[in-house]
Amino acid sequence: MNYGLTHTPSLNMSECLVLGVFSDLALPDFATAIDNEQQGLIKKLCQRVPEPGNTVWQTDVEGHSLLIIQCGKKEGFSANSLQKRVGEITEALIKQRFSSATVCLPRLNQESSEWQLEQMIVQIDNLRYQLLDFKTKHAKSHKLESVIFHLPGATEKSLEMAKAIVSGVEFCRDLANMPANICTPTYLGEQAISLSKQFDQISCQVMGPEEIKEMGMGALLAVAQGSDQPPRLIDIHYHGNKNSAPVILVGKGITFDSGGLSIKPANAMDEMKYDMSGAASVLGVIKACALLKLPINLIGIIASAENLISGSAVKSGDIVTTMSGQTVEIINTDAEGRLVLADALTYAERYNPDFVIDIATLTGAIIVALGNIATGYMTRDEQLAKSIERAANESQDKVWRMPLDEAYQDALESPLADMINAGFDRSAGSITAACFLSRFTEKYRWAHLDIAGTAWISGKKRNATGRPVPLLIQLLRHVANSR
């Protein structure tokens, strides 16, 4: 996909000129000039779009097309309005099978041109994204290949930033959408190594079962023991500032989750290929950071395995010793994500991080609580919470803070081990899962993102979303600017 900027939009710049207009303001100068050339055509068309979101097409204007979209009154043109208009425009362009367009939307009142440009590009790229295709007979495909923006105040720098973000999001989505027979723990490791070969500032180490055993990662090994696919611990570094403490992102990389002996229902089990979306987001963020050349140190740690059923699979009631030395009684084999994360979070201690954020499709309970709009997050660190909230607001990648009160820890008590891996009832499932993780994060500042509701769209049109890559990149940009 090609994105560009122009100061002088015209009809012949692309297949379609898209013009957003206000109901209470005159046309901008460039549109007035085009209107005069076309004998008042634009003003006539504007009369046919009285309400926000109304559109009108005019084809064969000097061999090109013109799309007018009503944006309402200037005072009411908000970030939410922008999102709606961009969505309507993108869907219209794709439906009409245009390959190129010049988009001229008004400036927002409260946001910078740089921010607006990033949001438009991220949204257009999300909507034009096409699933990986394994069909043997291909329908003739069509893509929107080029969009040029007219947005006074936007710069080439902001354009390049937006392109880096969508590159990271696309990489995340491609990995998450991959079928589990292809995207195995080994494949994830290979993708991380591939990134290190693409960028000089990235290095990578991928560890297998023997190294994992030597480090005492009993929880990760327990989850993996039911599968023929060997587990992987992926340790990938982006070296952007050798003098600063690293930020660490820990990703859950369960490439397929049957639930183990606590087996999941058959309905929609195919979507459990998305249980490695946390790992995919970590790799997507690292790729974007390398493209942006952010002056930070960033480490991605991914604990990857399959959670399957076999004669050697871990059983309910088994007790394992984690890398931290703490013991866990496995009450539910379908609460496996927190087990692999426990060892990965302990592994993170060696780097003396500034802070750690884990990203995981961890609980169905967070979907019950928040649906697919906001990612649930938990932390005890108020400064980190403020940073996450700020980044979420700026990136439009929504979050909602959930409690992490000490009283919830009681649900994890075990008569036989230091803790159980899941509560005996279904109450506060996302909170008690975070409480479990908190027991492995006492040596650094930490936050947990539960993306089970936001990492993919379920059903017939199932598709990875690429979240929370935009949120995390925005957070890291603030970290970079503070150093």
From Swiss-Prot:
Mn(2+) 2 binds at residues 252, 257, 275, 336. Its cofactor is Mn(2+). Transmembrane segments: none annotated. Keywords: Aminopeptidase, Cytoplasm, Hydrolase, Manganese, Metal-binding, Protease. Binds 2 manganese ions per subunit. Its EC number is 3.4.11.1, 3.4.11.10. It catalyses: Release of an N-terminal amino acid, Xaa-|-Yaa-, in which Xaa is preferably Leu, but may be other amino acids including Pro although not Arg or Lys, and Yaa may be Pro. Amino acid amides and methyl esters are also readily hydrolyzed, but rates on arylamides are exceedingly low; Release of an N-terminal amino acid, preferentially leucine, but not glutamic or aspartic acids. The active site is at residues 264, 338. InterPro entries: Leucine_aapep/pepB, Macro_dom-like, Peptidase_M17_C, Peptidase_M17_leu_NH2_pept, Peptidase_M17_N. It is found in: Cytoplasm. One of its GO terms (molecular function) is metalloaminopeptidase activity. Presumably involved in the processing and regular turnover of intracellular proteins. Catalyzes the removal of unsubstituted N-terminal amino acids from various peptides. Belongs to the peptidase M17 family. This is Probable cytosol aminopeptidase. It comes from Legionella pneumophila (strain Lens).
